[in-house]
């Protein structure tokens, strides 16, 4: 059963709260020993979240008005996706999922899983795409297990200066 009282496409006035959620998530990851999203703590945002909000690609999941979680669903691959997915990024068949983040006040309540389940229904019905593609640091076993447990197929690894990334996709 979902804890969300609403799921909304983020509006520009949500941007400050969204960026705070991302920074808090990056701080939590750092405390857990992960450098994923570390750039956010230096004021760098490779996904340009405010612009993604303006494009209508950011979805927020609320519980009684509070943001419990968020996700970015990009209909067009960004430069990172094109680097990582190479020729597949140009097939037009997929949504690229980025910045799945859960408010730590909701930890342990399957919020991430609920966001992913919502996404798997929303993408084919509303965005008319048949594949979700995503990546995460290979060095985070729990995160890789999270996606495998949701039946995402591991399709390879990509490397950049920040590390090695596991690539996952799910055909819907």
Model-derived segments and spans:
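Conserved GNAT acetyl-CoA-binding A-motif
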Residues: 116, 123-135
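Conserved acyl-donor/pantetheine-binding loop and adjacent beta-alpha core of acyl/acetyltransferases
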Residues: 72-99
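Conserved acetyl-CoA-binding loop-helix of GNAT-fold acetyltransferases
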Residues: 102, 108-121, 145, 149
């Amino acid at each position: 059963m979902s804890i969300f009282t609403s799921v909304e496409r983020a509006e520009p006035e949500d941007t400050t709260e969204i960026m705070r959620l991302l920074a808090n998530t990056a701080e939590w990851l750092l405390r857990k020993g992960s450098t994923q999203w570390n750039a956010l703590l230096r004021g760098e945002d490779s996904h340009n979240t405010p612009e993604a909000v303006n494009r209508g690609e950011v979805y927020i999941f609320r519980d009684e008005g509070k943001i419990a979680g968020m996700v970015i669903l990009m209909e067009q691959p960004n430069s990172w996706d094109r680097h990582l997915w190479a020729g597949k990024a140009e097939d037009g068949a997929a949504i690229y999922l980025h910045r799945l983040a859960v408010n730590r006040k909701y930890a342990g309540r399957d919020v991430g899983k609920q966001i992913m389940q919502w996404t798997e229904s929303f993408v084919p019905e509303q965005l008319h795409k048949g594949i979700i593609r995503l990546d995460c640091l290979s060095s985070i076993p729990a995160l890789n297990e999270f996606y495998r447990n949701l039946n995402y197929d591991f399709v390879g690894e990509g490397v950049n200066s920040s590390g090695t990334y596991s690539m996952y996709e799910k055909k819907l």
